Amino acid sequence: MKRIAIFTDGTWNSPGKGSPTNVLHLARGIKPVFEDVEQVAFYDWGVGADRKTLMGGISGVGIDKNIMDCYRFIVHNFNVGDQLFLFGFSRGAYTARSLGGFIRNCGILRREHAGQIPAAYQMYRKRSKSASPNAPGSVGFRRRYAWENITPIEFVGAWDTVGSLGIPVPFWGTLGEKEFLFHDTEPSKIIRHARHAVAIDEVREDFQPTLWDKKPDIDLQQVWFSGVHNNVGGSYDDRGLSDHALRWMVDEAHSLGLGFEKHALDTIKPDHRGKLYNSRRGIYMARSKHQRTIRGAIHESVKRRWQDDVDGYQSRCKPLRALLTSVGNDWDRIEIAGTGTSR
């Protein structure tokens, strides 16, 4: 048995860019062996990170390739009994969640049938009743080419999922919507544990979060953190806020067996007083604001930031103010998620 960890980054993110995202930080910190179990990692650059940056970032045309690249790595490395851990930020989170849907639909192909990956993906893309996971065609495809049983995914960790949209073109709206509606991003029964860190303070209408709905048979936690999109997923120079979301995700994955290098853990330094950046700049100024609505637990660092009124947070954070108003300013009626300790 080994652990296979897949890391998919956000739009225009790549290893050579400034401060690393949380996805890249984790990918660099995976131990090759932890508790006598081999661990292998695959990092996939964000949509639009290659030479086709503009169109890839605007329309998400690279998302098909990202999903298939991640899936191909799994096919080439997987053996029965291996555990799968999937991580992603922004559109990379959308990619990771779509990858989970792809595996649910087509299984994991045996290595000798890796040439069938394009056919498997086309079947997944149909998103029709005839190509659903339980349809005769899908079942027959898996029996012919995939490992015998649909493999459970041990863990999916997402930071502020947005769909294939995300990047607006002024006066044209947002490109790429219809092309990517086929993706199955809902947590399916093959996912055992799912974690989603969501940004409270993001106001760009093109970055509305793709939230998960609770399902009784899945261990799902969706926790809200202070900050805008990249304050939660990382890449800003001031990592105080993003390190809260990173530390939480590390603790959750570690509790399920994933091991990290000491150097990666030692550099995580959460700070609830960290800088809250302004993401509504440039072309986004021409677009409307969209206040997010908090649904679910908030991280304990949010409460501390509010109580300390860091940089006037009590007047600036409208979603949290609305939540507090709805419960009569009674913190005991709000679910608070905390942190643990990682090795």
Regions found by a protein language model. Give the residues of each.
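Active-site- or binding-pocket-proximal scaffold segments within functional domains
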Residues: 1-343
